From Swiss-Prot:
Residues 1-22 are virion surface. This is Matrix protein 2. The record marks W41 as: Seems to be involved in pH gating. The record marks H37 as: Essential for channel activity, possibly by being protonated during channel activation, and by forming the channel gate and the selective filter. It comes from Influenza A virus (strain A/Singapore/1/1957 H2N2). GO terms for biological process: protein complex oligomerization; symbiont genome entry into host cell via pore formation in plasma membrane; symbiont-mediated suppression of host autophagy. One of its GO terms (molecular function) is proton transmembrane transporter activity. A lipid is attached at C50 (S-palmitoyl cysteine).
Length: 97
């Protein structure tokens, strides 16, 4: 008899498990990990917009400016802004026949 039929055998009009070693530490650890995984998955699905928005905008703050003189910071800001302005001014016009 296979393990599958042994586990899924009806016991007293209910579906049950015939394993007697369910207090095994490995089984307990697997159950805890499974429950934590389910909780984290549910939280991820509920709050995925907040979570991913935080990571998306939180990681785009740019390089650290700690220890950099203010004049160099201002120069860097101007370079970044001029690069953004240059990108905004280039548009391609496509006409379909």
């Amino acid at each position: 008899m296979s393990l599958l039929t042994e586990v899924e055998t009806p016991i007293r009009n209910e579906w049950g498990c015939r394993c007697n070693d369910s207090s095994d530490p490995l089984v307990v650890a697997a159950s805890i990990i499974g429950i934590l995984h389910l909780i984290l998955w549910i939280l991820d699905r509920l709050f995925f917009k907040c979570i991913y928005r935080f990571f998306k905008h939180g990681l785009k703050r740019g390089p650290s400016t700690e220890g950099v003189p203010e004049s160099m910071r201002e120069e860097y800001r101007k370079e970044q802004q001029s690069a953004v302005d240059a990108d905004d001014s280039h548009f391609v016009s496509i006409e379909l026949e």
